[in-house]
Design a protein with these regions (language model features):
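Serine-hydrolase catalytic machinery in alpha/beta-hydrolase-like enzymes
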Residues: 20-44, 50-118
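Short glycine-rich catalytic loops that host catalytic nucleophiles or stabilize transition states
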Residues: 203-210
């Protein structure tokens, strides 16, 4: 049953009342895997009595959890965000290499541990990513729109949801001079109209630049996440 759920890209973990004590503020390893594990950042303002927004951040091809978090760590304390990052089993995410499965399983375990240890605002659970991670965030986020209320995709290349659940709000950004995932080549200028035509509330931000996440764009995305109704 669990294998079928993973192959369908489905996540089972949900926010709940914590039953364990989480780590104090700062950056911590998840301790779920001996290699290619993951990280969680707990903001200084975190309180058990005040559930915090959660952002699951996914790295690009060849990346890791530390690299994924570098776009957002400086904003976590400002916005009071719990930041979670896991690492793909291969050099990039499973559906890009082959099909859904091993990475969904790892993400579900990381989320289950996070929900068990920390008070998470169920109304602000975001999946985010950069490059291949952005493509995976769109794919997994739409498939699990009954869990993720927000999807943030920095420079995505495609989306491959298995199904559509819920009504997550979506933020997409892309550089007009991106040499890695050109904005016109099956990327954001095609993805955004498809999402809007399907009925998703989508905010789109183009910027002059390449395959990066400018500081003002990441800040705009976090403001959007924490202020959208």
């Amino acid at each position: 049953m669990r294998n079928l759920q993973c192959q369908a890209g489905q996540l089972l973990s949900r926010p709940s009342v914590p039953t364990e004590t989480g780590a104090s503020s700062g950056l911590h390893s998840l301790g779920l895997e001996p290699e290619r594990d993951g990280l969680i950042y707990v903001p200084e303002s975190y309180q058990l009595a005040k559930p915090a927004p959660l952002v699951l951040m996914l790295h690009g091809a060849g990346g890791d959890a530390e690299g994924a978090l570098r776009w957002l760590t400086g904003l976590a304390d400002t916005y009071g965000l719990l930041l979670l990052a896991v690492e793909s089993r291969d050099r990039t995410w499973d559906v890009i290499v082959s099909r859904y499965g091993p990475d969904i399983a790892v993400i579900d375990r990381a989320l289950e541990q996070t929900f068990r240890r920390y008070a998470v605002d169920a109304g602000r659970v975001a999946i985010a990513g950069f490059s291949d991670g952005a493509s995976y965030a769109l794919s997994v986020g739409i498939t699990n729109g009954d869990l993720f209320t927000h999807i943030i995709a920095f420079s995505p290349g495609f989306m491959a949801p298995v199904t559509q659940r819920g009504e997550p709000q979506i933020f997409i950004s892309h550089g007009t001079s991106d040499p890695v995932l050109p904005i016109n080549h099956r990327c954001s200028r095609r993805i955004v109209p498809q999402l809007q035509q399907t009925g998703y509330d989508t905010r789109y931000r183009e910027f002059e630049g390449g395959h990066i996440v400018p500081a003002d764009v990441s800040r705009e995305a976090m403001t959007w996440l924490t202020t959208q109704a």
